[in-house]
Structure formats: structure tokens, C-alpha cells
């Protein structure tokens, strides 16, 4: 399977900082445009996610970057051969853990209290495609 990807991230006309970040094949993208083509072999791994920092709170850009970097480390460290059920369980555990890390960051840095992010994307693992 060949994946043709393009990432475009821009601060826009309203805000002064970009709270969004994309993770594409191990690279982080904010305030940039790039293209990427990946040829997935049966056991290839690939990840493409977008984390959108929550507007209305300080630190959305911090939360989105924390989530993207954390997912990259999580995904890179996954062992081979996990069953679908085990993989899904590990992803759910990761979601709980990164949520706690982001909340703890806000608790430790009061100026960022309430920070948060959304995260959506897909990843390829062991010949299957998953949505997150």
C-alpha cells in the first residue's frame, strides 16, 4: 500500500500562536507544509496524527506537543506481535497516561491550568490500519 500524505499547519489570522501539531512518520510539524509518501510493507509501521490544542486556555500548544511526542514514543516502543485486543488495550492505557501527564503539567504550572488537546489520526501496525 502506498500512502501519499500532505501536512499543512498554519497559525491562521486570529491567533498569535499555533496550538496544532501533526505527527507524520516520526516527524513533528507545526507552522509548515510538507509532503510524504510511504510504501507500507505487510509489517511496516506508520503513524499520522493531528493534535489540536484547546483554544480558550493557555498552553494548548504545549498539550498538543506533549500528546504528539508521547504517542510517537509509545508507538515506536510497541513490541511486535501484539493481538488486536492487546494493542487496543495498550492504546487505551496510553490515552489515560497522557491525559494524566497533561493534567499534572497544568497543576504544576498554574498559568496553564486547564490546558488540553484533542488527538485524531491513524496508524499502521502488523498489516492493519487503526484509527485513534
Spans of model-derived segments:
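PP2C/PPM-type serine/threonine phosphatase catalytic domain
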Residues: 1-132
Amino acid at each position: 500500500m502506498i500512502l501519499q500524505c500532505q501536512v499543512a499547519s498554519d497559525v491562521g489570522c486570529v491567533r498569535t500562536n499555533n496550538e496544532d501539531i501533526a505527527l507524520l512518520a516520526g516527524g513533528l510539524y507545526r507552522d509548515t507544509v510538507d509532503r510524504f509518501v510511504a510504501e507500507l510493507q505487510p509489517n511496516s509501521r506508520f503513524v499520522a496524527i493531528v493534535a489540536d490544542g484547546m483554544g480558550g486556555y493557555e498552553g494548548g500548544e504545549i498539550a498538543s506537543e506533549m500528546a504528539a511526542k508521547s504517542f510517537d514514543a509509545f508507538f515506536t516502543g510497541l513490541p511486535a506481535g501484539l493481538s488486536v485486543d492487546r494493542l487496543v488495550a495498550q492504546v487505551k492505557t496510553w490515552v489515560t497516561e497522557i491525559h494524566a501527564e497533561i493534567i499534572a503539567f497544568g497543576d504544576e504550572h498554574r498559568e496553564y491550568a486547564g490546558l488540553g488537546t484533542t488527538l485524531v489520526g491513524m496508524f499502521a501496525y502488523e498489516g492493519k490500519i487503526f484509527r485513534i
